[in-house]
């Protein structure tokens, strides 16, 4: 049954006072949530940036989630993770769209670890058709679709304003082929303790960012700031100031492509005084939330 969590304290109140106290707590931003697995309520979420939009997330329940794993080809991938064996285990594999700096090593990781690759339906279908990944190691879903790939973990695909294309080196011809891959998405990843991460993938500004924030209530936002292909620092700061309400924001998708000139310093300047904690990360750094 639902419980009210207020740090680690338990208060015994007369029944007559309970309603008033509950109303006060809820109005202060504390939410009722479903019972979590044992230990998940106090465990931390570890977020490791692997460069560009690539992240490894270790959930409070000990699961390893990999998002947009551009590792062997990524110019900013930490040296250790150029070897896919360094991942050790992958319980959940998510890709936001088909561009190489997001799809990256996902097919190889799926096959190496026997992990199902979750992604937009129109990206997964051509990957299977061209033989990049077996059908039994894929799961197709789409914007507004939710899945529960692991106990206590829920993933919802949400809108991203971006394109998607798979470039595949055909071994039979030795030439690259381009395959349309539908539309890009972002992900709301809800972990065992209710902590929610919005990985925005690649996106420009769009007004429904406000709706996504209001409806899904993310705690942590991973937001692209590089510009040219995505929002630049000023765009991203506008979204965070005006549309998105979260506790933390981590800038991503910069410092890897010379065409994407947005900088951390530019984002920090544009975010000055914003009501959200900016958590700048360096490639290879892990932060607990």
Map each language-model feature to its residues.
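Active-site neighborhood of phospho(di)ester-bond hydrolases with catalytic His/Asp-centered motifs
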Residues: 67-68, 90-98, 118-121, 197-203, ...
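Active-site environment of divalent metal-dependent phosphoester hydrolases
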Residues: 73-74, 100-104, 124-127, 145-148, ...
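Pre-active-site segment of Zn-dependent metallo-hydrolases
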Residues: 59-99, 104-111, 119, 125, ...
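Flexible, acidic/histidine-containing loops and adjacent segments that form or flank the divalent-metal
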Residues: 146-176, 277-289
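Binuclear metal-ion centers of metallo-dependent hydrolases, dominated by the metallo-beta-lactamase
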Residues: 117, 131-149, 237-289
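Zn-dependent metallo-beta-lactamase
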Residues: 6, 14-17, 21-64, 71-73, ...
């Amino acid at each position: 049954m639902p419980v009210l969590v207020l740090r680690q304290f338990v208060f015994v109140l007369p029944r007559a006072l309970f309603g008033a106290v509950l109303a006060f707590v809820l109005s202060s931003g504390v939410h009722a949530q479903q019972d979590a697995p044992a230990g998940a309520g106090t465990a931390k979420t570890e977020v490791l940036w692997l460069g560009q939009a690539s992240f490894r997330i270790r959930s409070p329940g000990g699961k390893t989630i990999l998002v947009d794993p551009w590792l062997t080809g990524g110019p900013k991938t930490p040296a250790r993770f150029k070897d896919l064996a360094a991942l050790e285990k992958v319980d959940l594999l998510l890709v936001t769209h088909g561009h190489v700096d997001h799809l990256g090593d996902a097919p190889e990781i799926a096959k190496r670890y026997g992990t199902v690759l979750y992604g937009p339906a129109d990206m997964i279908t051509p990957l299977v058709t061209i033989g990049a990944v077996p059908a039994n190691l894929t799961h197709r879903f789409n914007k507004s679709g939710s899945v529960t790939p692991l106990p206590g973990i829920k993933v919802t695909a949400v809108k991203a304003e971006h394109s998607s294309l798979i470039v595949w080196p055909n071994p039979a011809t030795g030439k690259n082929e381009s395959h349309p891959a539908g539309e890009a998405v972002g992900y709301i990843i809800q972990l065992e303790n209710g902590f929610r991460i919005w990985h925005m993938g690649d996106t420009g500004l769009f007004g429904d960012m406000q709706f996504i924030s209001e409806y899904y209530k993310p705690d942590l936002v991973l937001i692209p700031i590089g510009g040219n292909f995505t929002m630049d620092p000023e765009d991203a700061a506008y979204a965070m100031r005006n549309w998105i309400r979260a506790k933390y924001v981590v800038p991503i998708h910069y410092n890897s492509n010379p065409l994407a000139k947005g900088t951390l310093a530019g984002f920090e300047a544009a975010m000055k005084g914003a009501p959200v904690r900016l958590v700048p990360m360096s490639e290879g750094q892990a932060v607990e939330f």
